[in-house]
């Protein structure tokens, strides 16, 4: 009798454990034909598209009742609606080389090297395999990488990271917190050939010869619910019950020199922008005053511009996003949680009753 009873106990443990695991994390989706990857974790879903290099993210519970969708009918098997107003999307729009005064430079007629890319969204990106059980700076995460060759032989790479646990990460001089469900994307430009007025010939914005490139402006198209995203500090975030993002272990009294900039993007979500870049993966260089620059271009559309320093090697920028629970879902979440908890409790009670009866 002992062996059957032991087997039943193990079966019970396995079954109930599977219920818990299923409720914690949803499965990912990879479609290599369409070149799309969907990563899920910690009530966050991220869609990565190889065609155009678009990255979208939103709050998502696999078992929620679709009440965050205002423009779409409910379906029996709910899927993420990345066109929902609470979703955020990011896409590299353009790259433009500029001189020391910030004016564009362009290729001369004798040069075959391009010094701007005006439609990055038309490029085809290669999509790496999804790493759904990896780490980033010792934190559990999922990652996928997009890569495209630019017309001037430079390379554009986007590494998308979805964190699965809370922790602290570093980017150059900046140390800040990430949450389970934080999504970040490294943007790496490698091998950009700058105008030097000699070996690489360029024209100024007014078609004057011997122009010299000094920086590279990389622009992102951003879609978010907030029409005019507001910069918020940790004190203001604390008013809504959010923990500090900034971490400065060297000098707690320093005036946030080593802290990223945080924007409220609407829908309880926020974007975290570093003030500097990494050159050749090791040297932290602060961006010029006024950058990164976020400006409104439409009702929900924004243009986010980073000014990158001149280098023959690589430059990395590192935006991240904390997805919050949409306000209209907050009141409904408790009901959903209670329903899920009640179902698990009922299932456990039923199985324990059967177990007791067998003994």
UniProtKB/Swiss-Prot annotation:
Subcellular location: Secreted
Expression (tissue specificity): Component of the acid-insoluble and acid-soluble organic matrix of the aragonitic skeleton (at protein level).
Disordered as annotated region, ranges: 60-83, 224-254
Cleavable signal peptide: 1-26
Coiled coil: 66-89
Main subcellular localisation: secreted
Gene Ontology, cellular component aspect: extracellular region
Domain of life: Eukaryota
Keyword Ribosomal protein: no
Keywords noted in UniProt: Coiled coil, Secreted, Signal
Protein's name in the database: Acidic skeletal organic matrix protein
Organism for this UniProt entry: Acropora millepora
